[in-house]
Amino acid sequence: KASVGFKAGVKEYKLTYYTPEYEVKDTDILAAFRVTPQPGVPPEEAGAAVAAESSTGTWTTVWTDGLTSLDRYKGRCYHIEPVAGEENQYICYVAYPLDLFEEGSVTNMFTSIVGNVFGFKALRALRLEDLRIPTSYTKTFQGPPHGIQVERDKLNKYGRPLLGCTIKPKLGLSAKNYGRAVYECLRGGLDFTKDDENVNSQPFMRWRDRFVFCAEAIYKAQAETGEIKGHYLNATAGTCEEMMKRAIFARELGVPIVMHDYLTGGFTANTSLAHYCRDNGLLLHIHRAMHAVIDRQKNHGMHFRVLAKALRLSGGDHIHAGTVVGKLEGERDITLGFVDLLRDDFIEKDRSRGIYFTQDWVSLPGVLPVASGGIHVWHMPALTEIFGDDSVLQFGGGTLGHPWGNAPGAVANRVALEACVKARNEGRDLAREGNEIIREASKWSPELAAACEVWKEIKFEFQAVDTLD
């Protein structure tokens, strides 16, 4: 006999893992899952299955269960609520004991919580909507290399959003031509330029050549403008060793910031790079390439607010967070919800903005949200109002598409931003008077006037796919 109390066979998950009377602990990691069970599967069983399969459970009773304390280690589905307006869809709340997770490892946390359970047959679909990271777990992470305040101090830039530009065409330029475009944009008044996320080290432009020409552009623009400038040098590579080699070379060149694609590169690589950046005084810009594969479907996958929280733990000083007004997906309330999760120290539960749990980040620095994708000078008042000062506004085509060239495109964006910040500080309503503010500024800035003329008809108006219930 394996053990006296052992009874072989399959038993319902809800007998062990559905515990509505459970009182959550301050140290538990809490998860809110949107569960769509298969027909005939009751929500209690579905919620319990999620808790089991993402913690200690498996499909049958095993005698080694008797060798440990399941009550101490199991995940528990402690609350279930139907989703309003949806048939057979439920929000299931699961509590995980902290001992299930390795300290300081987003990789391990995700392997458990969003691992095999997402392929589970009893569920038609499953989406992780939000996580509550307890302070005791948060304190095991370094988090962002520097954070918002240290970045402002390094750059000596206060009281306004920062301006960026992604260099286009994203692929095909030689390193010297690329560096020239960087110089022109920085010289015209931008704070940053950016490697596109898919610029790594391709045959037409090897990484080392790009780094050298971009560094030259930065130093030249700094000398001419008296402002600190940066270019997000993409260190993403095929191996962690190669990624670190690129980051080290960037530091040797004396540039202020590097960049990483954190989802395609992976959380382990990202956390290593973030640690290096803090130790060596480099800022870290994070691109979220591949996020929509994970977060765009409303009933399956993982919401971006979870990916944003994971990034704050893993480490990054900037992250792309949608624009609300440009060409890429992002509903206003939802976007502002995870923008607050990135920047603020303490965020109250607020279901109207998709925030399922109160989150306390204790001592973790904040992350600057980056608005990028299909934005131009006419969007500047809305962006300034929506995102406030602690943000990076990135105009790729909206700089390089200027009819007079790159530097005048940068001038137009800087003038528009300064005009919006000045108007806001004078108490004007950017939402209502935005167009007028831009028109007034364009009277004394021919560069802005030309930009206004080119983009006056451009709109990206489609319904957001991911909306609040």
Swiss-Prot record:
It is an enzyme of class 4 (lyase). Its EC number is 4.1.1.39. GO terms for biological process: photorespiration; reductive pentose-phosphate cycle. The modification N6-carboxylysine is found at K194. Mg(2+) binds at K194, D196, E197. Transmembrane segments: none annotated. Binds 1 Mg(2+) ion per subunit. This is Ribulose bisphosphate carboxylase large chain. It comes from Pachira aquatica.
